[in-house]
Each structure stands twice: as C-alpha cells, then as structure tokens.
Amino acid sequence: MNPALLITASGLPALLDVAAPHLEWGPLAPVFVLMAGACVAVLVEAFVPRSGRRSTQIIVTVATLVVAIASTLTTIARGTRIVAGQGTLAPDGPTLATWVILLATGLGTVVLFAERVGTTQTAFVASASSVPGSPLEAKAEQEHREHTEVYPLLMFAALGMMCFAAANDLIMMFVALEIFSLPLYLLCGMSRRRRLLSQEAALKYFLLGALSSALFLYGIVLLYGCAGSFKLGDLAAAGVTQVGSSKLIVAGMILVAVGLLFKIGAVPFASWTPDVYTGAPTPVSGWMAVATKLVALVGLMRVLYVGLGAMRWDWQIVLAVVAVASMGVGAIVGLAQTDMKRLLAYSAIAHAGFVLVGVVGAWTTQTGMAEGQTGSVSSVLVYMTAYGLASIGFWLLILMVRRAGGESTEIASWAGIGRSHPWIGVLVVIFVLSFAGIPLTAGFTGKLVVFLAGWRGGYAWLVLIGVLFSLVAAAFYLRIIVVVFFRSAKEGDDPVEVAEPSIAGWITLIVCAVFTIVMGVAPQPIIDLFNQASTFLR
C-alpha cells in the first residue's frame, strides 16, 4: 500500500501528519507585546488624521515599551528558563537582561525622536522622498509635516533586536538580523540636517550591510553543511567531534563572525561607522551606538560560547587581534576629529575593542568553561549598560546645542557653553568622564569588569593594551571638557544656542546622569544582578 495513503488517528495521511507548532506565550510575551505595538503603530499611520498622528504614535510607542519591560521583568521574576519557539529562541538570563537594557534604551530613544528644539520640527526630514532643496521639500517644511513612521520603524527594529539576542538557531538569527537592519537603513536617510550626507550614509550602510549579511548567510550555510542542523546545540556537538579536522567549521565560523563584528562596529569592519553616525539623524545615531552594538555582542557570545566553544583556540586569538585593532584605530584616529558626531563614532569603535576584551577572556584552562563564560557575559552586560547611559544622555545634549541651520556638531562651536549654561556643562562632564572610564562613573565600572574578565581569562597582555589605549582615548574626551569650559567662541562665528529640553528630555538627562554616578559609586548591586543572569541555555 502507498504509505501516503495511510490514514492516522487525526484523519490525515501519514506523510501530512505534522505536529502543530507550539509557542511558549509566557517567556516570549515581551516579543509579542512589541510586535502587537508595532502593528498598531502601522494602523495609526493609516487611519489617524495627520494632526493627531504624532501624539498618538508617541503614546503607542511609550506604552508598548513600558508594557514590554514589565512583561520582561515578570518573566525574570518567574525564574523559568526554557528554549522556546520550537528551539529557535532561548529567553534565558542573558537574553532577558539584554531585553531590559534594550527596551529601557528604547524609551530614551523615543525622547530623542520626539524632541522638538529650536523650531517646531524634529530631527527628521519633512519629506524624505523629495529631492534635497527642491520646491516640494520647501513646501513640506512650510506645512510642518513630520515623518511619524519613524516610531513603528523604531519598534520593528527593537523587535528584530530582541529576537536576535534570543536566537538559538542560525536561521532565526539571520531573519532577526534583517528585521532590525532594514528599518535602520531607512532611518539613517531621514535626517533634516545635511540631507545629502544623510542619504549617502544610508546608502553606504545599506550596501555594506547587505554585503555583511551575505557573508553571514554564507557562513551559516557552511556551518549547516558540517553540522546538518541550524541549532547551536547541534553545531556544538559537531564541533566537538570534528575539532582540529574540519576546515568547514573554521570557514563558516569566520564568515559568521564577520557579519556580527560588522554590526558591533569593530575594526576592520567599521569603515561605515564614522560616515553613518555623522550623516544619520542624531537620535538614530544614538540608538545605533547602543542597541545595535549590544545585541550583536550578545549574539556573538551565544554563537561562540554555545555553538563554537570547542573551536575556542581558533577564535580567541582572532578576536584578541580585532580588539587591539579596534581600540587602536578608535583611540588614535579619534584624536584628530573636529566633529562631535564623528568623534563619538570613533569612540564607539574604541569601545567595541574594550568590550571585546571581556568576550575574549571567556574560555581558558585557568578559569574553566562555566566560570569564565559567566564572568564574561555579565561583564559585557555591565559595560553596555554603562555605555548606554552615557550615550543616550550625550546624544541628547548634541540635539540641544544648535545654530540657525540645526544642530551644531563642530567641537569648536561648543566653546564656552559650560560657562554660559552650567547645567549642560555639568552633564557634559558626567557623560564624558564615563566614556573615558574615570573612577566614580559607570564607565569605570564597565571597563573594570571587562578587563578583569580578560585578565582572569589569561589575557593579561590584552588588558594592558586596553589600559594604554584607554589613556589615549581619554585625551580626546578631556578635550571636550576643555573646549566647553576653558575656550571662548571665535569672533565672527555664528552664535550657538543651547535649547531647553522638554520635560521628558530633562527626565532622560537626569536619569542617565544619576545612574551613571550610582553605577560608579555603588556598582556591586548591578554587577550581582547581571551575574545571576549570565548563563546561556544550551
């Protein structure tokens, strides 16, 4: 008898009797909340009149992020950690911690998106599809149009980032990568200021991002050819049995790492970072500096620790070289920058190198697998929390310092604003000292824990190089303080104005500044929390 004609108890032919997919709604609730909120935001664009669209989008976005944070905290409180979504998603400790950081950063980013300073307009162009300088663009400006689509794009990007951080399957990781990359490509080209530069940034990011995605996918194919599965656990089993003999795993590992290091912004895959950060709208640059780097780091650690742990002798030294190159390029080239956004781009490259020191120290014979891995994961989460606080706050300050044409990002134009506006001077000092890793700030705590992870992992030489380049990078951070307090504006230059933040802007700045200091003065509670959430499910 033809086996296709066999009838099962369900009434279906045997070959068609496929088990229905099962989703664990509880652990994945934050993902579903964000997905629902993003879909509602799309409907708002379609059905809400233009006059009420902006306020409605802000309410929907903030409410969605708050509910998603509450849902994540509820999942953490329950304490159950399972592999969900047919084995494709792992809402484990690192994932849940990443979700909290990501969603909290998203709330700060909404403030940047919505901030109106100097004029009635935001940082986003009135008509993205019009030719820069055309009558159509001028008409859109006169009518005070806004692209409120940026809010659903933000939520879809956050949705992809959440899935990426939780991905326990290489295909899910690739799909999530594309989900959060595509909205970012669009957002990068929507700057109101320097339209042509913004469009150039979006095109560069898209082309190089497409190349990195292709390499990432090719690496997945090679790993699948070796393991016969896309799941990281199966890949780990294949690596154990074939270690030292399979060139296929090594080639696939390199290509996957290239795709992830591109998103982290590590040398030599960081050529896009200065141009994109400079040309993109300031709120988008701030969001990318924190969120993209955070989820890419967590994804990299999950692939290396869970799937490719047996190949640690191959990837450790490569990552160490990448870390040194990133620290060196970011710190040295940053010294020559005269534009604030471009300086922060090279700062982000240097920070990518610093945080990779902790990633490299995960696997050694001295610490053992479990202890070394746990210390590295928690150190990366602490570092990115500290970096996120300073970044969101400082990028918001960039929105405040303005000239007639928009934001004033030349470092020299900030001369003396610390004396004329003491509040912005104090905030600049707090955030810049945190970037530099000065004691009693969150940045010092972050660097301390990642350097300790590298040291305990047997990479003392890498830590010493990191300390050296930290001193180099401190020079251009301190230069900002010198300009803000001890320099005067040149005669004949256009005057610079410092806009007053909105109430939400003030709250964001105060929260970022306070937690930056608290993490520097009393870091142990946050370190303990991340230590408890630092083990990947396998």
Curated annotation (Swiss-Prot):
Organism of this sequence: Cutibacterium acnes (strain DSM 16379 / KPA171202)
Family: Belongs to the complex I subunit 2 family.
Regions that span the bilayer: 28-48, 57-77, 94-114, 147-167, 170-190, 206-226, 249-269, 288-308, 315-335, 343-363, 380-400, 424-444, 458-478, 503-523
EC number: 7.1.1.-
Subunit relationships: NDH-1 is composed of 14 different subunits. Subunits NuoA, H, J, K, L, M, N constitute the membrane sector of the complex.
Membrane topology label: Multi-pass membrane protein
Name listed for the protein in its UniProt record: NADH-quinone oxidoreductase subunit N
Gene: nuoN
Cell compartments where the protein resides: Cell membrane
